[in-house]
């Protein structure tokens, strides 16, 4: 790992770290204000595919988080960038609330499959349609491959198991655009004009948030909220730079030890 430099940016996960669905993590709003009062740039990075960036921003504002749209980098944005780069016509296996992120994208006569978290669409008929497109040579683009995520009623299957099922059935490999992919973190940091060695990632997912960030040279802080389960910090190597109770505790550490 490259030598550490002065801290310039903090990347923060959203669901599970700042909030869990429509409930804020206790103390998160005030902690974010304290972090913003420093010289570091704060950006929000999320694999959320259940809703558009606009809807996500409205949810955060209702929870009294002071966040602007241009501060949020989502895996939906990364997926659209790849679709445009490859000039494909995707079959969109995404939640209907996420469709505004793909406005203007040609989907007639699809020659690619894009899959995110879409519980209402993960049924045999649509998955079989995707399967047949892939057999005909269509590329598979996974917005992310999270195993599960946190809801108010408990943990729930993420898109990862469904992506893996299509990979297995068609003997193909998905192109993944969200966390923990290196390109996702690098794109988020590019906007902040920041090198990985000048940044910290805070999240509740040991693999997608912490391991992904640390693989490009960032420091990773794992919080014990959201999808965190006991001993998650032991599942990755190297382990997280820090494991703490919640986002406010992570901010306390940054203010006391990294600035």
From Swiss-Prot:
Binding-site positions, Mg(2+): 13, 15, 204
**What GO molecular function annotations does the UniProt record carry, in alphabetical order?**
enzyme binding; metal ion binding; phosphatase activity
From the record, give the transmembrane residue ranges: none
What SUPFAM superfamilies does its record include?
HAD-like
Q: Where does substrate bind?
A: 13-15, 46-47, 179
Annotated coiled-coil positions are 47-72
Keyword annotations for this protein?
Coiled coil, Magnesium, Metal-binding
Q: How is the cofactor bound?
A: Binds 1 Mg(2+) ion per subunit.
The protein's required cofactor(s) are namely: Mg(2+)
Q: Which residues carry this modification: N6-succinyllysine?
A: 50
* Protein family per UniProt: Belongs to the HAD-like hydrolase superfamily.
**Annotated protein name in UniProt:** Haloacid dehalogenase-like hydrolase domain-containing protein 2
Protein source organism = Mus musculus (Mouse)
Q: Which gene encodes it?
A: Hdhd2
């Amino acid at each position: 790992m490259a030598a550490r430099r002065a801290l310039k940016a903090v990347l923060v996960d959203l669901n599970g770290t700042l909030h869990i669905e429509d409930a804020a993590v206790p103390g998160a709003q005030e902690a974010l204000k304290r972090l913003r009062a420093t010289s570091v740039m704060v950006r929000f990075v999320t694999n959320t595919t259940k809703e558009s960036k606009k809807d996500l921003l409205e949810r955060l504002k209702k929870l009294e988080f002071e966040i602007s749209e241009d501060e949020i980098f989502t895996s939906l944005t990364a997926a659209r960038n790849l679709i445009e780069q490859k000039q494909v016509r995707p079959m969109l296996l995404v939640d209907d609330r996420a469709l505004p992120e793909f406005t203007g994208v040609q989907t007639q006569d699809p020659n690619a499959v894009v899959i995110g978290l879409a519980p209402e669409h993960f049924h045999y008929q649509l998955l079989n349609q995707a399967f047949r497109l892939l057999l005909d040579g269509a590329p598979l683009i996974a917005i992310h491959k999270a195993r599960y995520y946190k809801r108010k009623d408990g943990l729930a299957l993420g898109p990862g198991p469904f992506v893996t099922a299509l990979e297995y059935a068609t003997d193909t490999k998905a192109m993944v655009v969200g966390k923990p992919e290196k390109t996702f973190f690098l794109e988020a940091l590019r906007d902040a004009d920041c090198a990985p060695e000048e940044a910290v990632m805070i999240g509740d997912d040991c693999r997608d948030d912490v391991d992904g960030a640390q693989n490009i040279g960032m420091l990773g802080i794992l919080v014990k909220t959201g999808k965190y389960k006991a001993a998650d910090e032991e599942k990755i190597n190297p382990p997280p730079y820090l494991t703490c109770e919640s986002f406010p505790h992570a901010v306390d550490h940054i203010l006391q030890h990294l600035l």
